[in-house]
Structures are given as structure tokens and as C-alpha cells.
UniProtKB/Swiss-Prot annotation:
<keyword id="KW-0472">Membrane</keyword>
<dbReference type="InterPro" id="IPR008011">
    <property type="entry name" value="Complex1_LYR_dom"/>
</dbReference>
<feature type="region of interest" description="Disordered">
    <location>
        <begin position="136"/>
        <end position="162"/>
    </location>
</feature>
<dbReference type="GO" id="GO:0006120">
    <property type="term" value="P:mitochondrial electron transport, NADH to ubiquinone"/>
</dbReference>
<keyword id="KW-0007">Acetylation</keyword>
<keyword id="KW-0597">Phosphoprotein</keyword>
<feature type="modified residue" description="Phosphoserine">
    <location>
        <position position="85"/>
    </location>
</feature>
<keyword id="KW-0679">Respiratory chain</keyword>
<protein>
    <recommendedName>
        <fullName>NADH dehydrogenase [ubiquinone] 1 beta subcomplex subunit 9</fullName>
    </recommendedName>
</protein>
<dbReference type="InterPro" id="IPR045292">
    <property type="entry name" value="Complex1_LYR_NDUFB9_LYRM3"/>
</dbReference>
<keyword id="KW-0249">Electron transport</keyword>
<comment type="subunit">
    <text>Mammalian complex I is composed of 45 different subunits.</text>
</comment>
<dbReference type="Pfam" id="PF05347">
    <property type="entry name" value="Complex1_LYR"/>
</dbReference>
<dbReference type="InterPro" id="IPR033034">
    <property type="entry name" value="NDUFB9"/>
</dbReference>
<dbReference type="GO" id="GO:0005743">
    <property type="term" value="C:mitochondrial inner membrane"/>
</dbReference>
<keyword id="KW-0496">Mitochondrion</keyword>
<keyword id="KW-0999">Mitochondrion inner membrane</keyword>
Length: 179
């Protein structure tokens, strides 16, 4: 049961939400007609909502375990996997053709003039990122435990009154200074 590999690091709420999403995705594979899918999805939502406010964690954990076992027995043998998702037919297929963003810096001014709004906004973001990069890295280093992150959750948002975080697409890359 590979889907439980990160189980100890997730909260109960995260486990329930992931189970619900997996169940809906498998239900989508069973019910290809949209109206039938919607009907059974509403029934499933009602089953989850029935125990939403459960205060007893022992009972809630037992319910989650039973729900995961039921999901295991009722899952689709060949669930639909989106082509660009991991395990899909086109996963990472076209990454070699994607042009990195820094290539836009080499555009000729006449080419940039065709998209003035985009390049004006892009220059503002680049300037903002250059100005706040050191603070971003410092904040991430302060909030990351010495042994590395203990969960797969992303770091929290910035402190109140500060700029929004700019690391949403850099979070999986090494922390080098941006261009």
C-alpha cells in the first residue's frame, strides 16, 4: 500500500482529505457518465460529512482505517491517470522542449514591444525578487528544522506586513541567487 508511505507525517485531516480525493478519482473511473458520477460523488460526500465533527480521535482513526480498507477493496483496477500526471503517458515527455524563463531576457526590444504589459509586469517581479531574495532564503533557513523538513507541507507564508513569498516554483530547486 504505497499510498500510505507518508502516513506518519500527515495530520488526520490531511489523511482524510487525500482519501476523499483518491476515492473520487477512482469513482470517476467507475462512473464514466457524468450524471451518475455526480450522484455517487454526492453520496460519498455525505458519508464523509457524517463523521466530520467527530471529537473522539480514537474513533476517528478507526473510521479512517476502515475507510482506507474499504477504498482498497473498491478501487478501480485500472484508474484513469491524467496524461501529464506521474504514471501518465505524457509525464515529463515534453520538458526538454520547454524554454526556461531566462531566455526571455535575450529577446530583441522589438519583440518585447509586441507584449508591453507582460514584460513590464515581468520586470517588476524580477526587481522585487532580486530585492527580497536574501530575506526569502534567510526566512526559509530560520523556519526549516536543522535535520530538514519533517513534513511535506510547504513553509508558512511570510510574516504579516511583509512581501508575499516568491519561492513557489523555486522550492524544489537549489537555492542559488536568481539572475
Amino acid at each position: 500500500m504505497a499510498f500510505l508511505a507518508s502516513g506518519p507525517y500527515l495530520t488526520h485531516q490531511q489523511k482524510v482529505l487525500r482519501l476523499y480525493k483518491r476515492a473520487l478519482r477512482h469513482l470517476e473511473s467507475w462512473c464514466v457518465q457524468r450524471d451518475k458520477y455526480r450522484y455517487f460523488a454526492c453520496l460519498m460526500r455525505a458519508r464523509f460529512e457524517e463523521h466530520k465533527n467527530e471529537k473522539d480521535m480514537a474513533k476517528a482513526t478507526q473510521l479512517l482505517k476502515e475507510a482506507e480498507e474499504e477504498f482498497w477493496y473498491r478501487q478501480h483496477p485500472q484508474p484513469y491517470i491524467f496524461p501529464d500526471s506521474p504514471g501518465g503517458t505524457s509525464y515529463e515527455r515534453y520538458d526538454c522542449y520547454k524554454v526556461p524563463e531566462w531566455c526571455l531576457d535575450d529577446w530583441h526590444p522589438s519583440e518585447k514591444a509586441m507584449y508591453p504589459d507582460y514584460f513590464a509586469k515581468r520586470e517588476k517581479w524580477k526587481k522585487l525578487r532580486r530585492e527580497s531574495w536574501e530575506r526569502e532564503v534567510k526566512q526559509l533557513q530560520e523556519e526549516t528544522p536543522p535535520g530538514g523538513p519533517l513534513t511535506e507541507a510547504l513553509p508558512p507564508a511570510r510574516k504579516e506586513g511583509d512581501l508575499p513569498p516568491l519561492w513557489w516554483y523555486i522550492v524544489t530547486r537549489p537555492r542559488e541567487r536568481p539572475m
